[in-house]
């Protein structure tokens, strides 16, 4: 049965308006975005098929167009709608960590980095540049590709830090494998960068490694002492 033929108040859109978006299941939220189903398959069923096929929202939102459009009832238009929702979520996260904001909440930093890096299919090495009061100056993606001790150049990091007049730095990168546990190469890179930054009196506050569902902090493990 089409959702428009359901009793008043039972459809996902009505439920959202009456009870709030937080009360909807993942499939119901997808149904609101998808809007229309196909013959014999309403939007809620399509949402459930998407979740079942991809295993969850994160995998769905990071899947390529050709893979998403393999699901019955999903074409380029619906794929575009899903991607727009995912991008809005990312942009909200960016606004939550604005220039001039003081980093007093580690959870805010973790959430920001998770949103920026967890869904990448390739490695990204980035810097979160801070001033002397630990206020955000800028988030910069510095290197992409296979990140190892040979591909991260301390002189480029130092040059950028000097250019932006940062007083402290949080370095971060993701593991496309989804496993956040740092490698020995990660530890070597961190030591090299810590020593390079020390020559210009800039503090390395942390190195955060981003996986699919967690972030490992070098500072919390005592690896920066």
From Swiss-Prot:
Name the Gene Ontology molecular function terms of this record.
metal ion binding; metallopeptidase activity
- Where, in this chain's numbering, is Zn(2+) bound? 173, 175, 186
User: Where is the motif (JAMM motif)?
Assistant: 173-186
Domain of life from the UniProt record: Bacteria
Tell me yes or no: is Protease among this UniProt entry's keywords. Answer: yes
Task: Specify one Pfam family.
Answer: RadC
Q: PROSITE patterns from the xrefs? A: MPN, UPF0758
Q: Which UniProt keywords apply?
A: Hydrolase, Metal-binding, Metalloprotease, Protease, Zinc
Indicate the segments forming the MPN domain, all copies: 102-224
Is this entry keyworded Ribonucleoprotein?
no
| GO terms classed as biological process | proteolysis
Entry's family note: Belongs to the UPF0758 family.
Protein name (database record): UPF0758 protein Sden_0326
Organism listed in the record: Shewanella denitrificans (strain OS217 / ATCC BAA-1090 / DSM 15013)
> Source taxonomy lineage?
Bacteria, Pseudomonadati, Pseudomonadota, Gammaproteobacteria, Alteromonadales
């Amino acid at each position: 049965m089409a959702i428009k033929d359901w009793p008043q108040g039972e459809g996902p859109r009505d439920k959202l308006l009456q009870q709030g978006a937080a009360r909807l299941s993942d499939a119901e939220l997808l149904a609101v975005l998808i809007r229309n189903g196909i013959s014999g398959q309403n939007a809620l069923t399509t949402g459930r098929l998407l979740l079942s096929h991809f295993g969850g929202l994160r995998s769905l939102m990071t899947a390529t167009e050709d893979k998403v459009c393999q699901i019955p009832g999903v074409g380029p238009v619906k794929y575009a709608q899903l991607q727009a929702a995912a991008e809005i979520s990312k942009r909200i996260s960016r606004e939550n960590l604005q220039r001039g904001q003081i980093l007093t909440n580690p959870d805010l930093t973790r959430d920001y980095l998770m949103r920026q890096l967890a869904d990448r299919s390739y490695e990204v090495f980035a810097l979160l540049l801070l001033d002397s009061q630990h206020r955000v100056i800028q988030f910069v993606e510095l290197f992409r590709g296979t990140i190892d001790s040979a591909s991260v150049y301390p002189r480029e990091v130092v040059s950028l830090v000097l250019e932006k007049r940062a007083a402290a730095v949080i370095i971060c990168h993701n593991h496309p494998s989804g496993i956040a546990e740092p490698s020995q190469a990660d530890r070597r890179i961190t030591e090299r960068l810590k020593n390079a930054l020390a020559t210009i009196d800039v503090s390395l506050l942390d190195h955060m490694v981003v996986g699919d569902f967690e972030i490992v902090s070098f500072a919390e493990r005592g690896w920066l002492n």
